[in-house]
A protein has these predicted regions:
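Glycine-centered flexibility motif
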Residues: 1-4, 116, 120, 134, ...
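A short, structured N-terminal alpha-helical element that caps or precedes a catalytic domain
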Residues: 1-107, 111-114
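Short, charge-rich amphipathic segments
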Residues: 4-12, 45-47, 79, 136-151, ...
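A short N-terminal interaction module
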Residues: 92-159
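N-terminal pre-triad scaffold of radical SAM enzymes
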Residues: 121-128, 164-184
């Protein structure tokens, strides 16, 4: 890596494709004496990421470009709006990087993962956020399959769980906190 911004997400995604491998993270330029079987280097360059990989038989490069949305309103943003915009931009960057890395890892290994490139988040939580944003189940399914590369089976499971959670929570003021205990 050339920075630590998305280290955990990238590490977990590589670990999912190579569960038996010993994975090391480095922020130093390698001197060519690296003994790793497979080497990835992620570099951020303005609005894009460059992912370089090298193994015994193959060397290549792929890139992930972040396309910034443009606002027709040139009014200055408030501090809160700036923080929200920065948080949204960071999420978009992470999503694009993980998508591109997942596609590369799929190409290198021939494997796919049922939960796609989702690491570090409960898929049902993601589906719940989309439900609360007013999306239909079919729109959520399409978003999860296209953006996060989740399998149709796992997409259906996440949406089912999110709808059940929403039904359970509909009469609870969960935005101000709640406790839920499962007793068997």
């Amino acid at each position: 890596f050339d920075n630590k911004e998305f280290e955990h997400d990238i590490y977990e995604l590589i670990r999912a494709f190579y569960p038996e491998a010993e994975i090391a993270v480095s922020y130093e330029e390698e001197d060519g004496a690296n003994t790793a079987d497979l080497l990835f280097r992620v570099e951020k360059q303005e609005q894009s990421f460059i992912i370089r990989y090298q193994n015994e038989s193959n060397t290549g490069v792929t890139s992930a470009e972040i396309i910034k949305g443009h606002s027709s309103d040139d009014a200055p943003l408030s501090c809160t709006e700036e923080k929200g915009a920065a948080r949204q931009q960071r999420k978009e960057q992470k999503d694009v990087l993980k998508y591109s890395l997942y596609k590369l890892l799929t190409k290198l290994t021939g494997k796919t993962l049922p939960w796609g490139n989702l690491t570090g988040i409960r898929p049902a939580k993601l589906a719940m956020a989309m439900i609360e944003a007013g999306m239909k189940n079919s729109e959520i399914a399409e978003e999860m399959r296209k953006r996060y590369l989740v399998s149709p089976e796992k997409t259906a499971l996440a949406i089912t769980i999110a709808n059940r959670e929403r039904e359970i929570l509909k009469d609870i003021d969960y935005e101000n906190g709640y406790s839920l205990y499962a007793v068997s």
